[in-house]
Amino acid sequence: MNTKYSYGKVYQVVGPVVDVVFEKQDDLPKIYDCLIIDEPNMKLHLEVAQLIGDDIARCIAMGPTEGLARNVKVTSTNQPISVPVGTEVLGRMFNVIGEPIDEKKPIDASVKRMSIHRPAPSFADQSNELEIFETGIKVIDLLIPYAKGGKIGLFGGAGVGKTVLVQELIHNIATGHGGLSVFAGVGERTREGNDLYYEMIEGGVIDKTALVFGQMNEPPGARMRVALTGLTMAEYFRDVNNQDVLLFIDNIFRFTQAGSEVSALLGRMPSAVGYQPTLAEEMGSLQERITSTKSGSITSVQAIYVPADDLTDPAPSTTFTHLDAKTVLDRNIASLGIFPAVNPLDSTSRLLDPSVVGIQHYQTARKVQMILQKFLELQDIIAILGIDELSEEDKLTVSRARKIRNFLSQPFFVAEKFSGNKGKYVPISETIKGFSEIVEGKHDDLPEQAFFYVGSIDEAIERAKTLTRNG
C-alpha cells in the first residue's frame, strides 16, 4: 500500500465541493484518492472527483465544510478511502470513513483496512448455484422466495413499512440462521438508526452485525459513499473469512439521490428527471460487487423508496434490472391494516420455479395468486352490485381470497411493542401446508378473522375455536 504523502492547499470552497491546488504536478492525486484536512478545529476527509488543469483536484467533502478557509494545508494519502474490516467491526457502528460513532473504544491501528473502491468479482469467480433463503415471513417464502446470494429490493413509498421489514429480516437471520449482517443506513433518519441500534442490543443480535451510517443530515459525499463502506465490510467476510453474509441497504434511493446532488455540484448536465447522466454506471458499480462467489455469498436486501409511488421513475427502474426478487409494498394493503403490506401480485421472484422450489410449493403459490387475481377482478362488480349478485363459485373465491389475504399478514418480532402481538417465525413447510389447505377448501367453514395476524394454520384453527366460543 502506497503511504507516500503529498501536500496541497485549499483553493476554493463551494458547499461540499472543495478545490485543492498542488504546486508540483507529480503531487497531483488520482481520481478517488482520499485527501485529509487536519486542523485544530476541523478534521475533514475529501475524495477526488475531478482533475482540473495541471494543478487542481476538485474534491467532494465527506463531512461539513463550515469554517473551512482558503490556503488551509491538505494532505493527499495517495490511496482511496479505506475502512476497517474483519471480526473487529461486529457489534460496532461506523461512519462513511470507518470511524466508530458508538462512543466505545477506538478501532485499533493494527486492524486490517480495505479500500472502498474495489473491482467486482470476475465472471469465473462467481457462483451460479440457486438456493432458497428461508426468512420465516410467510408472504415472502411462499410467493417471492429469496435466493441465497441474491439481490432483493423492497419497493414502497413513504410509511408503508420498508424499514420494519428490513429490521424483521435482520432479526430472523440472526436468530434463525446465526448469520452475519452488515447494515448500511444511507441517507435515512438518524432516529431510525438509533432505534435499530438499541433494538439490536435488546434482541441480542448486535454481536453478529456491523452498522454503517450516513444519515439525511450529512453532506452528499458521505451519503453517496456509505453504501460502499458497508459493502466493503461485507466483501471481507465473503472473500477472506469465506462466510455467507447479509447486506442491508436502507435506502438505495438515497444513494442515487446523493449521486444526483454531487453530479449537479460538479456541474454535469442532468439527465432524465434531473438525475445524473452516470446513474446506470454508478448503480452498476455498486450492484455488480454484491454477488456470490465460490468462497462465500453476499445476500443483499435493499429498501427502495419510490418517489410519489411512481415505479417508472429512473431511480427505482434502474435498480429493478439488478434484482432477483422484487417485493412491492402497497399503501392500499397497509390501509387495510395488513402488515407486512406486500402486494402479492406485483411482487416477483425468479426463484418461483418448480425446478427450484419444488412442484407443491410452486402450485400452491400459483393457486394463491390466481385466487387473489380473480378477487381483484371481482372488486368492481362487488363495489357496484354487491357480493350477493355473484355466482356461488365466485362467492367461494372471494371468501378464500379474503382468508388468504388475512393469512398473508404476520406479527413481527420487531413490532411487538407497537402491536402487542407476539412475533412469529414460520418455516416454509408450515407456510406451504397452511396455504395449500386454504386453496383446497379445507377451512372454508372458518371465519376470515381467524386468519388475521397468526403464524401457522394451526393457530388460525385455534383462533376460530376461540371466536366461536366467545360468540
Curated annotation (Swiss-Prot):
Molecular function GO labels: ATP binding; ATP hydrolysis activity; proton-transporting ATP synthase activity, rotational mechanism
SUPFAM superfamilies given in the database record: C-terminal domain of alpha and beta subunits of F1 ATP synthase, N-terminal domain of alpha and beta subunits of F1 ATP synthase, P-loop containing nucleoside triphosphate hydrolases
KW Membrane (keyword) present: yes
Lineage top rank: taxon: Bacteria
Keyword annotations from UniProtKB, A to Z: ATP synthesis, ATP-binding, Cell membrane, CF(1), Hydrogen ion transport, Ion transport, Membrane, Nucleotide-binding, Translocase, Transport
Disulfide bridge map: none
Pfam families from the UniProt entry: ATP-synt_ab, ATP-synt_ab_N, ATP-synt_VA_C
Intracellular or extracellular location(s): Cell membrane
Record carries keyword Nucleotide-binding: yes
First-tier enzyme category under EC: translocase
Transmembrane spans: none
InterPro entries linked: AAA+_ATPase, ATP-synt_VA_C, ATP_synth_F1_bsu, ATPase_a/bsu_AS, ATPase_alpha/beta_chains, ATPase_F1/V1/A1_a/bsu_N, ATPase_F1/V1/A1_a/bsu_N_sf, ATPase_F1/V1/A1_a/bsu_nucl-bd
EC number annotated for this UniProt entry: 7.1.2.2
GO cellular component, one term: plasma membrane
Main location (coarse class): membrane
PANTHER family per UniProt: ATP SYNTHASE (PTHR15184), ATP SYNTHASE SUBUNIT BETA, MITOCHONDRIAL (PTHR15184:SF71)
Subunit record text: F-type ATPases have 2 components, CF(1) - the catalytic core - and CF(0) - the membrane proton channel. CF(1) has five subunits: alpha(3), beta(3), gamma(1), delta(1), epsilon(1). CF(0) has three main subunits: a(1), b(2) and c(9-12). The alpha and beta chains form an alternating ring which encloses part of the gamma chain. CF(1) is attached to CF(0) by a central stalk formed by the gamma and epsilon chains, while a peripheral stalk is formed by the delta and b chains.
Role summary: Produces ATP from ADP in the presence of a proton gradient across the membrane. The catalytic sites are hosted primarily by the beta subunits.
Family classification: Belongs to the ATPase alpha/beta chains family.
Name assigned to this protein: ATP synthase subunit beta
